[in-house]
Amino acid sequence: MNYIDKDIKDFDDYIEFTTFNKFNVKILFTKKHYGSIPEKSREEVAEDFSLKDKIMVSSHQTHSDNVVLVGENPDETYFENTDGILTSNKNVAILTKYADCLPIFIYDEESKIFGAVHSGWKGTYQEIVKRAIEKINPKSLSTINILFGIGISSENYKVGVEFYEQFRNKFPKEIVEKTFSIKDGDFYFNNQLFNYYLLKDYGVKEDKIFLNNRCTFKENFHSFRRDKEFSGRNGAIMFMEV
């Protein structure tokens, strides 16, 4: 497995994932110190990160498996009921929001399509990352690169037996066994690892899937599990440098 913790740069207000820099794709993820993304306008975010020359595209996220592909001349820059945004438009910056759910960043070397999906347990159960890959429709899965952002770690993600049974009844036994653990009679779910094995099962190359050991719950990020109704949202910003 490819863990890329050493490729993550920490700043006061955000972190930067540098793994996709070789594709000229930048990925930023805001910290709690920056504030809550829904309380800021897209114009404010663009100005704060020197992206005023970009078209900032975002959505109302509903834990769906809906993914949109934004074209060269986008008529819409805000999408309802959407949890994945893709584009090959170098003028677009994609803004998605999280508070423990897993950000999954995608880049296809052939089509130059890049994007982000919001995959909490509902998105994972609905296989939103597969919906995104299907939307890209690559000639070969060998050109697909996947980078997991920072979500909640399994040690802080306690779930009920009904949750476990729901996944066990739908997915291959070997994937479920590798991604659920039991401690003192409680179940814990590894969302990142589950998506890793799903992607391998789809046919994405293992050496093009990148993981990390970070955790929103333990670190200076917004976390719904930790802060409950007082939790804000972290923002993931993905764009192509030109």
What are these regions (language model features)?
Residues 1-242:
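Active-site microenvironment for binding and transforming phosphate-containing groups
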